[in-house]
Amino acid sequence: MTSAESARRHPRTGPPGPHWTPATVRPVSEPSRHGPRYGTVDTDYALRMAATPPEEDGPVWMVNLMKYREIADYGDDGESTISGRDADDLYAPFEVLADIGAEVVFFGDVEAQLLGDSPTWDRIGVVKYPTRRSFVEMNSRPDFQKKHVHKDAGMQETIVIGCLPVDLPVFETQNWAEVPHPPTDDDGPITVVHVLRFSGDSTADMDAYSLVAGEVAIPHGVRIHGWFAAEGTIIGDGRTWDQVRFNAFPSRAAFHAVATDPYRLAAQADHREPALADTYAMIVAPGLDALATSL
């Protein structure tokens, strides 16, 4: 990734926000007056989303980290015998998303969590909304709220990060049929998702690491499907984040070869670890990956 220094935290587009007054904001669908059970709404970010004129609004990518209940909990509405994952499948508001011009651009189950102790995430999803206003308005629609009952029942915990694309490093894309560990029926493509919070102004260290990681990973077929700057966390556990990165590998064997490379490991110790205050890293089996074409 020979121009990693261009991949800063700065987004490519302008500031967020629909032309709403703060008094009209309803940042996240509320199953009750106490708000959703699976996380805490960041009202400051919601207000920022609501404070910018329409001409300064634009697309936002909402990155969802999902942890399910073992058994869905519908509260007073009745005893449940389905899993939290199944309840989330019932939620899936595809019709609502299509109606407002939003689309799911990434979706997959977490196979392994490499970094970050708790929670252990189950799924990752990304929805691209045409504007921040469309995201806010969606949450007050009756048809969305009806479906949201299933999300509240199935979700134990979630983090939803509003993101904008950053400029990507430029490098030659390898033909996956010609790399040392090509995809096979038994070992197909994976996406490694990194959720990053930097330690102070430490992008220089992260850039230095990315240069080395790129030198190692490019011959093994890595493809950057999207790097994003976090503009806010609309719902979560109170932590803030700086970036989310989606790197695709042709196979698990290819990722393993990169992860265990001594040159990359030395750069990780010298640069990546000092650069980060908090992180998750997950191997995801993508069921849908249209991130690159959504940028």
What are the residue ranges of the model-derived segments?
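Short, surface-exposed basic-aromatic patches at helix termini and helix-loop junctions that form
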Residues: S140, H150-A153
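Short, amphipathic alpha-helical segments
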Residues: Y129, M138-Q145
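A common structural junction motif
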Residues: D143-V149, Y263-A269
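Short S/T/G/P-rich N-terminal loop/turn motif that feeds into the first structured element of a domain
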Residues: T2-R123, P130-E137, G154-A266, P274-L295
